[in-house]
Amino acid sequence: MTRKKTNPFVAHHLLAKIEKVNMKEEKETIVTWSRASSILPTMVGHTIAIHNGKEHIPIYITNPMVGRKLGEFVPTRHFTSYENARKDTKSRR
């Protein structure tokens, strides 16, 4: 049996903001917390500030990003290697 293809998820408030900006035809940054929303072709050319848990990171949407999720482009974790922490303790001695 084949499965039915579902529509991409986009938060309704984000979609309303995008439509409003498209009608104005002005470039402005759209702020969102919805990392699970898919990128639609109507979003191409806009700058969307996506929340990473601490702050909003502005991302410019281009054609290759269509179909992917907003959260894929903003990392939520900051990597600190063990070696860097170890070198700092030696310099303090």
Curated annotation (Swiss-Prot):
Protein family (similarity comment): Belongs to the universal ribosomal protein uS19 family.
- UniProt-recorded name of the protein: Small ribosomal subunit protein uS19c
Q: Which gene encodes it?
A: rps19-A
Alphabetical GO biological process terms:
ribosomal small subunit assembly; translation
Q: Which UniProt keywords apply?
A: Chloroplast, Plastid, Ribonucleoprotein, Ribosomal protein, RNA-binding, rRNA-binding
Task: Write out the GO cellular component annotations.
Answer: chloroplast; mitochondrial small ribosomal subunit
Q: Which domain of life is it from?
A: Eukaryota
Gene Ontology terms, MF aspect: rRNA binding; structural constituent of ribosome
Q: Where is it mostly found?
A: plastid
Q: Where found in the cell?
A: Plastid, Chloroplast
For this UniProt entry, which segments traverse the membrane?
A: none
PANTHER family linked to this entry: RIBOSOMAL PROTEIN S19P FAMILY MEMBER, SMALL RIBOSOMAL SUBUNIT PROTEIN US19M
Main function: Protein S19 forms a complex with S13 that binds strongly to the 16S ribosomal RNA.
Extract the Pfam families matched here: Ribosomal_S19
The organism's taxonomy opens as: Eukaryota, Viridiplantae, Streptophyta, Embryophyta, Tracheophyta
